[in-house]
From Swiss-Prot:
It is an enzyme of class 2 (transferase). The keyword Nucleotide-binding applies. Glycerol binds at residues 87-88, 139, 243-244. InterPro entries: ATPase_NBD, Carb_kinase_FGGY, Carb_kinase_FGGY_CS, FGGY_C, FGGY_N, Glycerol_kin. ATP binds at residues 17-19, 265, 308, 312, 409. Pathway: Polyol metabolism; glycerol degradation via glycerol kinase pathway; sn-glycerol 3-phosphate from glycerol: step 1/1. It comes from Pseudomonas putida (strain GB-1). This is Glycerol kinase.
Length: 499
């Protein structure tokens, strides 16, 4: 605990896949200052995605300064800083100079597909699943880190000499903001690395040996809500959670059976399972989340690789919309998609398929298909993929969700939210506070330093802005969904690969 009597604000840093943001909250969890900066995406080869870690730090630092200036407050009035981040994205840097040895390898990047295939051939898949709760997929940090050590000249030798450090983005930012004094991560981020035992809550020696990772590179793993250190300007760094776990906490889904979907670049559906690490038989991940006080809890997660990025593709590559916000208007102009299905498997398929060799496709094209139908099919694909995951999740947990809480940029799209409720047959609740990912990090930081007293105080701040109720009948719903399943099957195993 720290003395927060004269400090009236919490800063949340929300380091995402395409932008860095800073959001300042007051004691009533109102937003009083924000700033956002986009940064460059690098695609050196097909299926590869990289970021510049120094640009991430620079944009994140700038947004903090800008948000404080916008709010008209000083560092001295800030009780604590919480960080939430794009997960799995992997940074390796020099301990002395603080310079990365390679670009950050982003969660979307598929370059370690062959490393994963070799792990499977060597018979490690079951152990990885049992120990980490994850599937053997290029999505997670461990094989990205192995790729850097294997492919960057001198990296492995330097890592073994203790000269290099590894971190996910939270770790990298805290190391930079603390002036190189603090090398930590939290349980939620560690659980996404493919190197962490989610049952013993330790780095797993056998997995480190399998991947060839020197243990001394790894950060210390700590709870999501505690004071880890201070920035150079003296602000307590007091909360960390991976973006999806942070959103789950920000939505107050802290009890078993509560679930949310975040619609961002990808879509992420998490269900809190309390102290039970539920094993999925449907290709979902078992991961670590935050309990009522930020302590370790478990969750089931389904990840959809391409959600909002599908709309970005319509805008930036096909150029059939000028602004993502316009998609609601165009989709609503037509009564249905005219039989068109868009499967956005640009980087393979995530849960529950886990097919890195699938590729995107448009199905059902006829001469009567207009641009509006394709735009509508793109939005519908986000809802269909969410249903894929939610169906699997409900079967694993043996219970039916009465409602789904939603957040992320795309929830502003009323067409998408209504179609989501229709295709699920479940109410969709959209909160008044849209910044739930940042809010979760702020809550974790505020609880750690005594800024907020506890969960009851936070629950009072959660207001539902609009509820979308299902309007499709069962026959229509299932006919549409059957068409989607048929389309997905046609995209599977498209890329050539070794067996």
């Amino acid at each position: 605990m720290t003395d927060t009597q004269d400090k009236h604000y919490i800063i949340a840093l929300d380091q995402g896949t395409t932008s860095s943001r800073a959001i300042i909250f007051d004691r009533d969890a109102n937003v009083v200052g924000t700033s956002q900066r986009e940064f460059a995406q690098h695609y050196p080869q097909a299926g590869w995605v990289e970021h510049d870690p120094m640009e991430i730090f620079a944009t994140q630092s700038a947004t903090m300064v800008e948000a404080l200036a916008q709010a008209g407050i000083s560092h001295a009035q800030v009780a604590a800083l919480g960080i939430t981040n794009q997960r799995e994205t992997t940074v390796v840097w020099d301990k002395e100079t603080g310079r990365p040895v390679y670009n950050a390898i982003v969660w979307q990047c598929r370059r370690s597909t062959e490393i994963c295939a070799q792990l499977k051939r060597d018979g490690h898949e079951a152990y990885i699943r049992e120990t980490t709760g994850l599937v053997t997929d290029p999505y997670f940090s461990g094989t990205k880190l192995k790729w850097i050590l294997d492919n960057v000249e001198g990296a492995r030798e330097r890592a073994e000499r203790g000269e290099l450090l590894f971190g996910t983005i939270d770790t990298w930012l805290i190391w930079k903001f603390s002036g190189g004094k603090v090398h930590v991560t939290d349980y939620t981020n560690a659980s996404r690395t493919l190197m962490f035992n989610i049952h013993s809550l330790q780095w797993d020696d056998k997995l480190l040996e399998i991947l060839g990772i020197p243990r001394q590179m790894l950060p210390e793993v700590r709870p999501s809500s505690e004071v880890y250190g201070h920035t150079k300007s003296g602000i307590a760094i007091a909360g960390i959670a991976g973006d999806q776990q942070s959103a789950l906490f920000g939505q107050m889904c802290v009890e078993p059976g509560q679930a949310k979907n975040t619609y961002g670049t990808g879509c992420f559906l998490l269900m809190n399972t309390g102290d039970q690490a539920v094993k999925s038989s449907h290709g979902l991940l078992t991961t670590i989340a935050c309990g009522p006080r930020g302590e370790v809890a478990y969750a089931l997660e389904g990840a959809v690789f391409n959600g909002g990025s599908t709309v970005q593709w319509l805008r930036d590559e096909l150029k059939i919309v000028n602004d993502a916000l316009d998609t609601e208007y165009f989709a609503s102009k037509v009564k249905d998609s005219n039989g068109v299905y868009l499967v956005p498997a640009f980087t393979g398929l995530g849960a529950p398929y886990w097919d890195p060799y699938a590729r995107g496709a448009l199905f059902g094209l006829t001469r009567g298909v207009k641009v509006d139908h394709i735009i509508r099919a793109a939005l519908e694909s986000i809802a269909y993929q969410t249903r894929d995951v939610l169906d699997a999740m409900q079967q694993d947990c043996g219970q039916h969700l009465s409602e789904l809480r939603v957040d992320g940029g795309a929830v502003a799209n009323n067409f998408l939210m209504q179609f989501q409720a229709d295709i699920l047959g479940t109410c969709v609740e959209r909160p008044q506070m849209r910044e739930t990912t940042a809010l979760g990090a702020a809550y974790l930081a505020g609880l750690a330093c005594g800024f907020w007293s506890g969960l009851d105080e936070l629950r009072d701040k959660a207001i539902i802005e609009r509820e979308f109720s299902p309007q499709l009948d069962e026959t229509q719903k299932e006919k549409l969904y059957a068409g989607w399943k048929k389309a997905v099957e046609r995209t599977r195993d498209w890329e050539d690969h070794e067996a």
